[in-house]
Every structure is written in C-alpha cells, then in structure tokens.
C-alpha cells in the first residue's frame, strides 16, 4: 500500500533582512580570522531601514574596519540605491563590541589544540539522506536553488526588475518516503513598481522555477504561488528588521531534521554551535555515502570548557544496514569530535564563512565546505563489512 505524505521547506535570498545580518556577521569573522586564526568572535548584526547595528564579543590581535566591511557587504548584496530605502553607501553603522568573558577564556584557551575546550554547552544535529545527489532533503535543496536562481537573474540583468529580497517554499509529495512530485511552489520576490503582476508571474515560473525544478515533478496538479499578496515592492530591511541567527532552519535541513537551537553566523569555530554542527553533518553524510544507512541523524553534545563530547547518538530511521550500536562504535573509532580536532580535520581556521551565510550551510559542493567531503565513506563501509556503496561526492 502506498503511503503518501507532504513535506515543506523554505529558503530566503541573500537580500532577505535576516540574511543581510548573517552575511555582515560572517564577513566580520572572515576579516578577523584571515589575520588571526585564533581569534574569538561572536558577532551579531541588526539591520533596519537606514541603520546597521553590529555588536558582540571579539578577542583578537587583528584589526578590522567593521564599518567598511558592513557597507561593502550591503552593497555586494545589491542594496546600492537610495530608492530601495536601504543603501550601503549612506546607511548608519553603529558598533558595540567588547571582549570575550575571561571566565570563558579560562575554560577554552591555553591548552593543546586537541584539548581545546568547547566554547559553550549545547547540542547539535547533523543529517544526511539519499534524496538528492548532495545527500540532503529535497525540499530544502530546491528551495535554496530557487532563490539562488532569483539572485542570478537579478545580478546578470536578465530580469532587471528583480530586487534583492526574496523567499521560496517547496512542498513535495512523498510516496513511501521518496519524493515523487511537487505539490506547491511558492516564490515571493521583491520587484520594481513598473512590472505588472502578470508579467512577473510568467517570468518567475518560466525563468526561475521551471529551469530549477525536475520536470517530472511538475504536473497539472502542481500549484504555483508567485507573490501571493499581489505586490512586493517594499522589502529588505525597510520592510522587516533583520537579525543574525534567525534563519537556523533555512541554514540547515529545512525542518527535516532536528535542530539544537544555536545559530552559526558570526561565530568562530571554537563555538561548537557551528563546528559541532558541521562535524555532525560530516559524520552523517559519510555514513549515508558509505551505505551504512539511507537516512542518518547524528546528535552530539558538549559542556563548556570540556573537550570530549558529553554524548554522541545516532538515528537511522529504520534504514540502517547494520545495528545502530555498531554504527555508534564506528563513529567513535573513525571521527574525533573534540572541538580542536574538528577544527583541524575540517580546516576551519580560514576565511570561508561569508559564503556559508546564504543558500544553506550543507549540501554545498564548493571546496571550502570541507564538512561535505565523503572521504571516510569507504573506510566506514569496509569497517561495517558491507558491499561497495555508490558514493557520488
């Protein structure tokens, strides 16, 4: 008997106000970590109308022009015209930055790298599945690709009436756990006032949605909701206040997997909210790529100042090819999840973070995304005593 379900995920463009804030936070981190790999950064941003407020705790020997970094980031996104209500050239930039608490420093720094203590307590999740070629859930994968296509057509001038702010939402129909069709696709994009809604709808469907979505998923039952309110001229930080760390489900698995609650952007890799989540994805992806399971969710947890995880757990949703206890043993044998070793293994002391702040931290194929490697898949497969797996990444 066929079991049919629907699942929905959303994404937002680089011009969405929350993503503007994320990119500013990670641009500041990149500028500092490129000079001082051992910097300690917790950088938050708030954007609204003509103002950006950058605050946080930073301890470093490096120097960064936070105001200019902020302006450059806003301009690169596309907010470069006063008529948009938010312009990187003219917006006010206010900063309030202190140093990391010495109580935290005492528990984190001053040790051998492999014994680097976790920068805070917390729990993180990593997930992978065989739904897509990047081992990610299909709804979030295609939601990201839609808003990325919107940005591409805006920047290359093909659809010159597009503006930076946009959102996508993809609802897929699943049969027996596998995606088979698109039930509903929502694309809301900011636009200049002169474009008619009829022309906008036609262009969005033909130029953004259809080139991205698999054609066999689109049928007469698929609903296309393009700018459902009928108008989206006012957008970006004029329409809504943006805040770092407010799109954590967009950043991860679109709701298909659990989330520990900590955001990523603006945090150096001593913060396990970020490095622990990247490592958990690395573990889960290698387990699935190695054929040990078709779906895998990893949870890891830490205590502040302690290097060893307080727990590691695995869930394969009934798709595991070996016992989960054995899978957990293999994780402990082949992955060192102490923060210092994660940083070393994944080469995280680099200025790679601004690129992660848009279109998801996972399922990316750029070489900077080292946690997407499947270099341990074959090792795990052999250790589990399984036949050769089809590893595509």
Swiss-Prot record:
Cellular localisation: Cytoplasm
- The EC code for this enzyme is 2.5.1.6
Q: What is catalysed by this protein?
A: L-methionine + ATP + H2O = S-adenosyl-L-methionine + phosphate + diphosphate
Binding of K(+), residues: 44
Question: What CDD domains does the record tag this protein with?
Answer: S-AdoMet_synt
Binding positions (L-methionine): 57, 100, 240, 271
Q: Which GO terms describe its biological process?
A: one-carbon metabolic process; S-adenosylmethionine biosynthetic process
Enzyme group, top EC level?
transferase
Classification via InterPro entries: ADOMET_SYNTHASE_CS, S-AdoMet_synt_C, S-AdoMet_synt_central, S-AdoMet_synt_N, S-AdoMet_synthetase, S-AdoMet_synthetase_sfam
One GO cellular component term of this record is: cytoplasm
Give yes or no: UniProt keyword tRNA-binding: no
Role played? Catalyzes the formation of S-adenosylmethionine (AdoMet) from methionine and ATP. The overall synthetic reaction is composed of two sequential steps, AdoMet formation and the subsequent tripolyphosphate hydrolysis which occurs prior to release of AdoMet from the enzyme.
Name of this protein: S-adenosylmethionine synthase
Q: Which organism is it from?
A: Coxiella burnetii (strain Dugway 5J108-111)
């Amino acid at each position: 008997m066929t079991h049919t379900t629907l699942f929905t995920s959303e994404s937002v463009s680089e011009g969405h106000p929350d993503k503007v804030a994320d990119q500013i936070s990670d641009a500041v981190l990149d500028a500092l970590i490129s000079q001082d790999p051992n910097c300690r950064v917790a950088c938050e941003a708030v954007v609204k109308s003509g103002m950006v407020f950058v605050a946080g705790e930073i301890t470093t020997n490096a120097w960064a022009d936070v105001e200019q970094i902020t302006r450059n980031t806003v301009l690169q996104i596309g907010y470069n015209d006063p008529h948009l209500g938010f312009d990187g050239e003219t917006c006010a930039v206010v900063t309030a930055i202190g140093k990391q608490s010495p109580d935290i420093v005492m528990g984190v720094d001053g040790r051998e790298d492999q014994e680097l203590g976790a920068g805070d307590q917390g729990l993180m999740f990593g997930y992978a599945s065989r739904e897509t070629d990047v081992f990610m859930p299909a709804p979030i994968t295609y939601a990201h690709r839609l808003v990325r296509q919107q940005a591409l057509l805006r920047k290359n001038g093909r659809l010159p009436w597009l503006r930076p702010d946009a959102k996508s939402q993809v609802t897929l129909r699943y049969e027996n756990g596998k995606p088979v069709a698109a039930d509903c696709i929502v694309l809301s994009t900011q636009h200049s006032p002169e474009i008619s809604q009829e022309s906008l709808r036609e262009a969005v469907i033909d130029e953004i949605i259809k080139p991205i979505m698999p054609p066999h998923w689109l049928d007469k039952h698929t609903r296309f909701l393009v700018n459902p309110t009928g108008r989206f001229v006012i957008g970006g930080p004029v329409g809504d206040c943006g805040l770092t760390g407010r799109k954590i489900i967009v950043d991860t698995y679109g709701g298909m997997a659990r989330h520990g609650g900590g955001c990523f952007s603006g945090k150096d890799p001593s913060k396990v909210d970020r490095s622990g989540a990247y490592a958990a994805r690395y573990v889960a992806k290698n387990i699935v790529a190695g054929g040990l399971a078709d779906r895998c969710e990893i949870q890891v947890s830490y205590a502040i100042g302690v290097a060893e995880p307080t727990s590691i757990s695995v869930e394969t949703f009934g798709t595991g090819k070996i016992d989960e206890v054995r899978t957990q043993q293999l994780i402990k044998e082949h992955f060192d999840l102490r923060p210092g070793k994660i940083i070393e293994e994944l080469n995280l002391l680099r200025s790679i973070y601004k690129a992660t702040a848009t279109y998801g931290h996972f399922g990316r194929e750029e070489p900077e995304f080292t946690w997407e490697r499947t270099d341990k898949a074959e090792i795990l497969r052999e250790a589990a005593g399984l036949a050769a797996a089809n590893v595509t990444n």
